[in-house]
Every structure is written in C-alpha cells, then in structure tokens.
C-alpha cells in the first residue's frame, strides 16, 4: 500500500490571543491573496469578523472572511455549530452585494446544527442567572455544543433523512421542553412547527455539503495553500480561558486539526493576532482593565478614549467592549498554548496621541509575583497588574505601510512587546482597510 500524499501546500492558522475582537477578519482577508481556501473550524454565528474593503464595511459571522476574495474556496468544518437561518441570511446579504457565495462555500456533513430550542435555552438561562450571567450572545451556541458532547446533536447530514431527523427531533424536544418548562419557566416549543422550519433547509444546504476533510487533504496535495480562521480568542477557550466566563468551543490553534479534519502536522504557521491594547465583551475578570461602560468604578479616561477611538462595540451584539492596557502576561500564556509562530498587532493607531502607554508584564497574586496568566477566573480576578511605562507618540501611525515610518517611541514599544512575548511581530495593522498594513515577515513565505 502506498503512503498518503505529503502536503505540498502551506497552511496558516490565524488565531486570536486575547478575548476575541482582535481584528482577525481583516488579517485573514489580507493573507487570502496567498491562500486558495479559507476554513472556519469552531464557533458559530456568535463571532463577527469585520472587514473594510475600499471603504465599505462587511461583517461576517459564519462564512469565512476569504469569501470577499474572488475565486477563493471557503469551508465550514465539522467543529462549527451551524444555524441554517443565520447562514442563509448571511448568504443573501453577500449575494445581494454582488458576492458569489453558494458555488464557493463547502460545509461539512458532520457539522452540528443549531435548532430553535438551543436559542430558547440560551436566552432563558441568561435571564435566570440574573447578575451572575456569563454574557452569551443568546444565539444557541453553548446549548448546541452541549448536545454535541451529550451525543444527541442533530447534524447537517441528518436533514437528508427526514424520517430519522423527525424521530431524533421528537426525542430532543421531549428533553429540552422539560428543561424549558420545568426549570427555566419558558413555554414549550412545538414539534411540528420546529420540524417544518428545519426540514426545508436540507434541500437548500445540499449543493454546498461535502466531505470537507477529504477536500482539504486533496487541496493541499494539489499544492494549494489553506488558511484556518479562528473565531473568538484564546482567553475565551473552553479549556484554557478564564473559565467559566468563556465560550463553548476550543478557540486555540490545535483545534484547527480536530475542527476541520486535518492532521496537526499540516498546521505549518500559527499567526497570533493581538490588539495594541486589550478589550473584552461581557462578564469575567480583566486584570489590566481601565473602562467598563456598565461599571461606575471602571471609568478611567484613557480607557474611555481607547473605546471611542477604537470604536469598541461588538460587531454582532453592538455591546460596548471593556478596554484596558495590553496584557503581555496573558499574551505569553496564549503564545504557549497555541505555539504561535509570529504576532500580528492590530489597532496600533488607536494609541496615537497618548502621552504615556502602559504594558502589563506580570501580576501580584496573593503576595507573589508571577509573569503568566493563571488558570481559572477566581485566580485571574485576584491578579494585580504590574506595568512598565513607555512614552507615547504624537505623530499619526494611521495607514502607515513601512516599519521605518513608525515613530521611534512606537518602535520601542513594539520591540518590548516582542521581548516579553518571546516571539517576533510579523505584521502590524495601522488601519481597518486591507492595505493599511506593515509586513515584516510573511506567514506564507518566511
């Protein structure tokens, strides 16, 4: 028997190193010049990737950012949880804007479906939690992953067998309606109405459904480059994030293998995305926090400025993001977990005009000095940040495309981030448009 073909294409994983919203969408779009396929491997439509192309803003939630490049194939892997309603709404929005989607989008038959009862449970739980809410987007992501782990999930391929789908749906509704009515004080969902809503999606999805794992292997064997587009960020990872204030999937680079069906040896370069400062949406500890719109005790003027200049509002929820200084100790944890090859720093221009810039390089935790983010939200909440201070710069970095054009103080700040992180900065984003980028090392070439 002959050995499997060795990958000839080069694969890059783009991963968030913070609490999401790092600017991954723009970077994926920029790098897609050198990739023939872009893959989503986890999460659902709770993550919004914002792209500014030619001054026009596009927000993608499910479909990979590569869809904005003509001729690039886009894949939704088995690790994603899929809302057909959200998917087709996004497809309609893109195609009405002249973007061809259906002929370029491929969906794994093993992808877990989000059903109406997942959304109902998600919203009802947050209401019941009250002040202790996690801060989910209410889109059914967590409950869908729960069903997957409990081995009762319905998958895309199940839509192609209506009798089987109906049987499994009835079983699931019996279970979830009990939870809704008896524990969450929510009305039961109707079986027939749910079935009638879901079954027609089978015919609409069928032309896009394929064996994604096999197609990715074949693409690499043919010499094509692939990009794996992470959603959310490392500090929201179900295992490695600030648990329990996390998302319901693994957001780290290693999950690109499991969530798309490729071997881990096929992940050749890990590009970690970090803002020049930190943001977080929803609840959970944030050691270097300066500003939280919902917390009167967190109204530092610099944090307010970061939020306003950086336009820090959730692209999916519209919720204001909490802001703070860049946390290099948390970044160090993310780099280790992901095996990051190089960093891309985004939104450097948001720091323009600040007299002083701070960088969190460690913490005091229960009287001890540590230089890496601890595990678990309780420990993180007790961390007191240890800062280094840097002089700011008054000249604008917006839109710059060359390292030498950066102010010397900005260069010094970036070099110190590299030193603390222990890996090089490969790219710097100086604005929202794809061309407002400084390239130092190319993930597909260096």
Swiss-Prot record:
Mg(2+) binds at residues 21, 48. It catalyses: IMP + L-aspartate + GTP = N(6)-(1,2-dicarboxyethyl)-AMP + GDP + phosphate + 2 H(+). Disulfide bonds: none annotated. It comes from the Bacteria. GO terms for cellular component: cytoplasm. SUPFAM superfamilies: P-loop containing nucleoside triphosphate hydrolases. One of its GO terms (biological process) is IMP metabolic process. Pfam families: Adenylsucc_synt. InterPro entries: Adenylosuccin_syn_GTP-bd, Adenylosuccin_syn_Lys_AS, Adenylosuccinate_synth_dom1, Adenylosuccinate_synth_dom2, Adenylosuccinate_synth_dom3, Adenylosuccinate_synthetase, P-loop_NTPase. Keywords: Cytoplasm, GTP-binding, Ligase, Magnesium, Metal-binding, Nucleotide-binding, Purine biosynthesis. Pathway: Purine metabolism; AMP biosynthesis via de novo pathway; AMP from IMP: step 1/2. GO terms for molecular function: adenylosuccinate synthase activity; GTP binding; magnesium ion binding. IMP binds at residues 21-24, 46-49, 137, 151, 232, 247, 319. Substrate binds at residues 315-321. Its main location: cytoplasm. Homodimer. Belongs to the adenylosuccinate synthetase family. This is Adenylosuccinate synthetase. It comes from Ralstonia nicotianae (strain ATCC BAA-1114 / GMI1000) (Ralstonia solanacearum).
